[in-house]
Amino acid sequence: MKGAMEPEPEVLLQEARENVEAAQSYRRELGQRLQGLREAQRQIKESASQTRDVLKQHFSDLKGTLGKLLDERLVTLLQEVDTIEQETIKPLDDCQKLIEHGVNTADDLVREGEIAILGGIEEESDKLWNFTKKASHIQLDSLPEVPLLVDVPCLSAQLDDSILNIVKDHIFKHGTVASRPPVQIEELIEKPGGIIVRWCKVDDDFTAQDYRLQFRKCTANHFEDVYVGSETEFIVLHIDPNVDYQFRVCARGDGRQEWSPWSVPQTGHSTLVPHEWTTGFEGYSLSSRRNIALRNDAESSGVLYSSAPTYFCGQTLTFRVETVGQPDRRDSIGVCAERQNGYESLQRDQAVCISTNGAVFVNGKEMTNQLPAVTSGSTVTFDIEAVTLGTSNSHEGGNAKLRVTISSNNREVVFDWLLEQACGPLYFGCSFFYPGWKVLVF
């Protein structure tokens, strides 16, 4: 018989199954951590190998350049020696030729005189006369001046041995090895058709003057610059949905020209559908990605809406005015609950908008508070949060209340927007009565 305290077989079987599941889950978790550990080890080894190669190549190039510079300097100094030697030796060579000519003349005169003297007065009187006459024509008391040694160049080389200490000090301080880059990507935030990239310094001793952000599709071979500046946040636009992109950032130290090492690349993607304008509207020309609308010269009026209700509460909708045309008080940029044709502006019911003169309209009524006028380069943002969502049945009191914040040119207005029905995704739109206005939405 079984012991009184022994569990039933069904209980034991259930516990065994639970233990197996727990062990499998534990094994999966350990496997994931092991994979992460291997990636970390690979990053250390690969970055160390790359750093060794960079150091070897750099110092090899440096030695070659320094050797070339020293050789060029040596050639220059030797040419200076040659020039001084040639210019200062020529007068002395000329003087030497003159003296040697005088010596030869004196030798000839001595020989002729000795012969004439040996011949006697009576026998060689003609020779004596000719010798005396010849000697009188030679200035035997005229001697060329030979410069003193202190008056002629004495070449030497002046070499400052302290350059060795200076070069040595610079070489000993040249280059550093860092265990990690001074900046790292901190956060990737998906946006419709874009990704916000935020980065931060991780080296407190590094003073950054500028940052440089690059990105690429994970299937591409090369990164490309997308931002250079002093900000620590940038939105990368023209991002295809559900496509992985890699981002990396580096920095330039204060007063320096060279860039720091790149941060560890971070991978991100956006699952949000890009905001697009409706195609086929006669009064507007669209970009290839349909996120930029240009009011053209066509004599057409009405509101250009988004192709679908792609704005959801809790997101930030941004309009950037690229170029401007002539303003009109009926112009509008904003959001609405539904597309309604036949209206020339979003200054109507079930819509909130800002006009190009800065006036704010809620359900067609102008607010007392006003924002600055829209100019070229202005950015207008809409942040909408649901206060009460309402219901889909109007007889149950289905009004929805939304908290709307419109920001432009460092000013903002906040108000509640009442809708007649439950809040779902919203449309956005714009209307301009004169050509030249170009608006990017993201």
Curated annotation (Swiss-Prot):
The keyword Oxidoreductase does not apply. Residues 181-274 form the Fibronectin type-III domain. The keyword Cytoplasm applies. Gene3D superfamilies: Immunoglobulins. GO terms for cellular component: cytoplasm; cytosol; plasma membrane. InterPro entries: FN3_dom, FN3_sf, Ig-like_fold. Residues 10-46 form a coiled coil. One of its GO terms (molecular function) is identical protein binding. Keywords: Coiled coil, Cytoplasm. May play a role in the negative regulation of cell cycle progression. Belongs to the cytokine receptor-like factor 3 family. This is Cytokine receptor-like factor 3. It comes from Mus musculus. The gene is Crlf3.
